[in-house]
């Protein structure tokens, strides 16, 4: 029964004038269970014929059938399955993967055949023991002799059953004793029912075969059969057809990726560096943005929540505002009666010289306020008490200091009930309030007194500088601002004031800081792109370096999708490690920053960290795809020929 049928097969290489006719109208049938030696000098076409038989190459024309199935009609994946299920390759140079142990090399074809880990390792150990390599399962190829490596190669060929064993100069790299051992193994496999096809240029080695086919200049010139083929039953296990990716294939691809990264530590580190810098930059910038935003919003809370301050004039740049003085205490009283208003405080101010004992302080701001001022502005009383409504009505000469002023005037004394002089008027200190958070630190002192006292006894005016309004909690501040504007405009007969809404400021700052974070993150993202290009470059180099490995994997049954998966996982792994390292570096930087900085801290968010990991993974997919695709598109013969 013919297992291989070849009819009028031709193979050309090159194009045009450079075309070389390597195989010329080859027609040959090989029976199942035969031991065939294809002999010929270098350049005769014998290796090309074996490559076509092993589905590593395709004919230019003619017919090639295996078990009656026309190979010219098969897809790339179907040819890979055929190599996995039917063939076992024995190479002259062994072609073992140096990073794997003997057992792992033997078990490799079973991964692509879809066998479980336990099943393939058990069979690998069984085959190694059968071939006299018991105890060598964990040895790397570099720890084995040439003869031992070739026996590992034979065991690998038998892993999935090896119904057809293709041996390319199997003794070419061995001494005579080791070569004879290999030939004895091939004869034994033949007796067990395997179909053996051996390529050699040595007639003495070819003599071991039952049938000798001699090729010269691409043509069969002699075909000698010694004995009829015995139809011995082959009881070797055969690989089952498989599809898609199995868990074992993914795990093996992951392990090989880790091995490749470890094998080139410095190169891998330098490749990751671009990703590390990019991720560190993005995460740190977002953390800085979050921290500064929280600090600014915390400072804004010093203005009070749901508060609006009404000023004279049309805006902060209005030079006529001081002369206009349109706001009055009556305006404040009228606003206090509105349903959307919770509290109101008129404000007046003056600046001048403050005297305590034999000390004088030239830069002192006196703020005239109502009894509800500290509640409206969200300021905390630290010591003593606040101003009462009665004191406002009585023009009482009482005052409060902020904490900074207290430290300057009374560094070691209790300020309560002490008398200070301002504008030649005595003021009794009744309390201390927390410093306002909004704004930069100032060298000026701040004291607070009833606005009636400031107006009647200090400035001598009847107008006020501003009115601060606290809006009720259940009222929309934008609606309240519109209503307040309409009310005062009608009351004054014109709009001679402007309003500063604390919520509007907060929203503006949030928007601004968000825009700045986006801008700086975009700049940092560029370094990620550069890092991704570095990953792609190194992966292209890796594909070139490991071309031989790719050819071996394809020869033992790996599909293009398996090769694509292998290198894509490696690129993703490099980027993920780089991304995680970048996040850890950013957290370390943040920890150090937060220890030494007191104004604000770096605030890391879970979202930014998760986004960074996903981003680095995506970079690996995008920039790793092209090198992985290049690897998958390699021709098996070209890859195997690469040194």
Curated annotation (Swiss-Prot):
UniProt-listed SMART domains: AAA
Compartments in which it is found: Cell inner membrane
Record carries keyword Transport: yes
Any Pfam family: FtsX
One of the GO biological process terms: response to antibiotic
Membrane topology qualifier: Multi-pass membrane protein
Domain of life: Bacteria
SUPFAM superfamilies membership: P-loop containing nucleoside triphosphate hydrolases
The protein's Enzyme Commission number: 7.6.2.-
Recorded name of the encoding gene: macB
Protein name listed in UniProt: Macrolide export ATP-binding/permease protein MacB
Gene Ontology cellular-component annotations: plasma membrane
InterPro entries hit by this protein: AAA+_ATPase, ABC3_permease_C, ABC_transporter-like_ATP-bd, ABC_transporter-like_CS, MacB-like_ATP-bd, MacB_PCD, Macrolide_Exporter_MacB, P-loop_NTPase
Residues annotated to bind ATP: 40-47
Keywords noted in UniProt: Antibiotic resistance, ATP-binding, Cell inner membrane, Cell membrane, Membrane, Nucleotide-binding, Translocase, Transmembrane, Transmembrane helix, Transport
Family the UniProt entry places it in: Belongs to the ABC transporter superfamily. Macrolide exporter (TC 3.A.1.122) family.
All copies of domain ABC transporter, residue ranges: 4-242
GO MF annotation terms: ATP binding; ATP hydrolysis activity; transmembrane transporter activity
Top-level taxonomy: Bacteria, Pseudomonadati, Pseudomonadota, Gammaproteobacteria, Pasteurellales
Self-association state and partner proteins as the record states: Homodimer. Part of the tripartite efflux system MacAB-TolC, which is composed of an inner membrane transporter, MacB, a periplasmic membrane fusion protein, MacA, and an outer membrane component, TolC. The complex forms a large protein conduit and can translocate molecules across both the inner and outer membranes. Interacts with MacA.
Function: Part of the tripartite efflux system MacAB-TolC. MacB is a non-canonical ABC transporter that contains transmembrane domains (TMD), which form a pore in the inner membrane, and an ATP-binding domain (NBD), which is responsible for energy generation. Confers resistance against macrolides.
């Amino acid at each position: 029964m013919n297992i291989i049928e070849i009819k009028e097969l031709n193979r050309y290489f090159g194009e045009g004038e450079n075309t070389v006719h390597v195989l010329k109208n080859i027609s040959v049938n090989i029976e199942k269970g035969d031991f065939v030696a294809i002999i010929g000098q270098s350049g005769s076409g014998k290796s090309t014929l074996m490559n076509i038989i092993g589905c590593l190459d395709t004919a230019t024309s003619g017919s090639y059938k295996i078990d009656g199935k026309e190979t010219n009609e098969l897809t790339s994946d179907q040819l890979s399955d055929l190599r996995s299920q039917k063939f076992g390759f024995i190479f002259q140079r062994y072609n073992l993967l140096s990073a794997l142990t003997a057992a792992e090399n033997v078990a490799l074809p079973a991964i692509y055949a879809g066998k479980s880990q336990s099943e393939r390792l058990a069979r690998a150990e069984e085959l190694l023991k059968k071939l006299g390599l018991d105890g060598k399962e964990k040895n790397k190829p570099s720890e084995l002799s040439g003869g031992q490596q070739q026996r590992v190669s034979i065991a690998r060929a038998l892993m999935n059953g090896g119904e057809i064993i293709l041996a390319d100069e199997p003794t070419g790299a061995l001494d005579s004793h080791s070569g004879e051992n290999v030939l004895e193994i091939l004869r034994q496999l033949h007796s067990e029912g395997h179909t053996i096809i051996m390529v050699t240029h040595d007639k003495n080695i070819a003599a071991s075969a039952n049938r000798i086919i001699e090729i010269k200049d691409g043509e069969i010139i002699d075909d000698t059969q010694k004995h009829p083929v015995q139809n011995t039953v082959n009881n070797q296990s055969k690989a089952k057809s498989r599809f898609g990716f199995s868990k074992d294939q993914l795990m093996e691809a992951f392990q090989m990726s880790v091995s490749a990264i470890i094998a080139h530590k410095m190169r891998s580190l330098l490749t990751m560096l671009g990703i590390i810098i990019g991720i560190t930059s993005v995460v740190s910038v977002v953390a800085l943005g979050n921290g500064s935003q929280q600090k600014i919003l915390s400072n804004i809370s010093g203005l009070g929540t749901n508060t609006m301050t009404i000023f004279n004039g049309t805006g902060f740049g209005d030079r006529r505002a001081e002369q206009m003085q349109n706001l009055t205490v009556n305006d404040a009283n009228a606003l206090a009666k509105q349903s959307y208003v919770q509290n109101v405080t008129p404000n007046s101010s003056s600046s001048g010289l403050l005297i305590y004992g034999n000390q004088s302080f030239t830069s002192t701001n006196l703020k005239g306020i109502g009894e509800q001022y500290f509640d409206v502005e969200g300021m905390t009383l630290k010591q003593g008490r606040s101003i009462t409504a009665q004191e406002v009505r009585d023009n009482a000469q009482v005052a409060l200091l902020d904490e900074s002023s207290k430290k300057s005037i009374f560094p070691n004394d209790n300020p309560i009930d002490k008398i200070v002089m301002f504008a030649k008027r005595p003021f009794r200190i009744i309390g201390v309030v927390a410093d306002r958070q909004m704004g930069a630190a100032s060298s000026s002192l701040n004291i607070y007194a009833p606005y009636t006292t400031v107006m009647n006894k200090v400035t001598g005016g009847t107008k006020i500088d501003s009115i601060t309004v606290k809006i009720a909690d259940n009222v929309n501040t934008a609606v309240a601002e519109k209503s307040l504007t309409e009310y005062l405009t009608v009351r004054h007969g014109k709009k001679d004031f402007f309003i500063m809404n604390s919520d509007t400021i907060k929203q503006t700052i949030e928007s601004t800081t968000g825009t700045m974070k986006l801008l700086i993150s975009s700049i940092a993202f560029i370094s990620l792109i550069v890092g991704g290009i570095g990953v792609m470059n190194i992966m292209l180099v890796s594909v070139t370096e490991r071309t031989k490995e790719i050819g071996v994997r394809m020869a033992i049954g790996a599909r293009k999708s398996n090769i694509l998966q292998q290198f894509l996982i490696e690129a993703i792994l490099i980027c993920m490690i780089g991304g995680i390292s970048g996040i850890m570096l950013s957290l370390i930087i943040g920890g150090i920053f937060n220890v030494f900085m007191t104004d604000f801290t770096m605030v890391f968010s879970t979202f930014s960290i998760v986004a960074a990991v996903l981003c680095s993974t995506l970079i690996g997919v995008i920039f790793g795809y092209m090198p992985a695709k290049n690897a998958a598109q390699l021709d098996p013969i070209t890859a195997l020929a690469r040194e």
